Amino acid sequence: MLNHVVTRFAPSPTGHLHLGGARTALFNWLYAKHNNGKFLLRIEDTDSKRSSKELIDSIINSMIWLNIQHDGDIILQSSRISRHIEIANQLILNDKAYYCYCSEEEINLEKEEYTKKGLHYKHNCIWKNRNPPIGNCSKVIRLHSDTEGITEFKDKVYGTIAVNNVQLDDMVLLRSNNTPTYLLSVVVDDYDMGITHIIRGTDHLTNTARQLLIYNALGWKPPEFAHIPLIHDENGNKLSKRHHALGIHEYKNAGILPEALLNYLLRMGWSHGNDEVITIDEAIRWFSIDKVGQSPARLDSKKLEFLNNHYINATNNATIIEMIIPIIEKTIGYKVNTEKIGYLLNGINELKKRTKNLVNLANESLFYVEDIPISFDQESLIIIKSNHDILSILYDNLSKVLNDDWNNSTLTSMIKNIVKDYNTKIHNIYHCLRASIIGRINAPSIIDIMVNFQREECLNRIKYARDMVK
């Protein structure tokens, strides 16, 4: 266990929290928890045009739903702009940065020349070692970058990473409108927050090299870095906010349990032997960066379905019902009464065994809680319309069964007698019972359902179905 570990998650509220961001948050949180450290949350909201309060709330709510809990107060990067400006000016005073008076037009022309020559663009500022022009000219602050040698750091996933300094230009630290750039703000915030370890995607590798130049210019000790491979879709294509990547709120709305999604994210690039189902307590106990692979992780919808089914079945029935009742009530348009919830509580175990998600489970549970008239699928309607006589026979015979005798043995025996007495097929009887009582053919044991519903509910449903085709 390491001493004094502080990690952070620093999303930009230009979109909802998606899988890649959630996995980054999870890995940082687990690393901090494993080492008895702190996990901080910073919202990088300095892009005022694309950031919004709604997206900030969405990110925070998604993390609450996932139960990834941060320590201390949430830090808004926009509240620290004066500190970022202070550091930029400090770099000027220490001759680690300079004012660049090049116009946007001049820079664009310079880029075009590099493109024509097929060269990697690197700005060569004519003002780097000159006196400023006369008058009130627009300017930016740029870092004095070393054009020789390499910038090297040890990554906890990929080992030693070396970037040729020729590729790193004199990056802008402060724009002409006096707003700090991402590269400067992140370094200042991470330093002030005491961040010791940064875990983020490999798409930040170049940013890390650039940020190390800023750390060096300021004489600050940088944190340790771990870059985790990106997540690809099932076809091996890179996920992004704009393509393929579902927001965490969409997984929630699709009926995925947070425990299942966390387990799924955990296994994307990290492993513990052959274990697939890993509880959050086990994850905290076992997590280490050296078990993160270097290859991109791929989405696997079948694995997510498997994990979700596992956690649904591991959750007690009362809790699951509490989760699906709002979905059911939205579907049927009225409040479910307490007696019907009792039916569902008695029968939900069989439904849980084969469900993929809570939405699917809610739909499969409708017949338990619907008032008459219940909903019928197309196959059930066809059976009902073509079996009026059988439904009448079932109603008449079942009406003779007393409440005290309404059990599995009596009902099974009566159905066998009906098959014999009326020269019909047993599967036809069961189809008619399913169609009239639950509105569909594919379902758990209809006898068990009838015992659960008890006499009056079953007779009322059969009577309604019979009378539909008078």
From Swiss-Prot:
InterPro entries: aa-tRNA-synth_I_cd-bd (IPR045462), aa-tRNA-synth_I_codon-bd_sub2 (IPR020751), aa-tRNA-synth_I_CS (IPR001412), aa_tRNA-synth_I_cd-bd_sf (IPR008925), Glu-tRNA-ligase_bac/mito (IPR004527), Glu/Gln-tRNA-synth (IPR000924), Glu/Gln-tRNA-synth_Ib_cat-dom (IPR020058), GluQ/Sye (IPR049940). It catalyses: tRNA(Glu) + L-glutamate + ATP = L-glutamyl-tRNA(Glu) + AMP + diphosphate. One of its GO terms (biological process) is glutamyl-tRNA aminoacylation. GO terms for cellular component: cytosol. A motif ('KMSKS' region) lies at residues 238-242. Belongs to the class-I aminoacyl-tRNA synthetase family. Glutamate--tRNA ligase type 1 subfamily. Catalyzes the attachment of glutamate to tRNA(Glu) in a two-step reaction: glutamate is first activated by ATP to form Glu-AMP and then transferred to the acceptor end of tRNA(Glu). Monomer. NCBIfam families: gltX_bact (TIGR00464). This is Glutamate--tRNA ligase 2. The gene is gltX2.
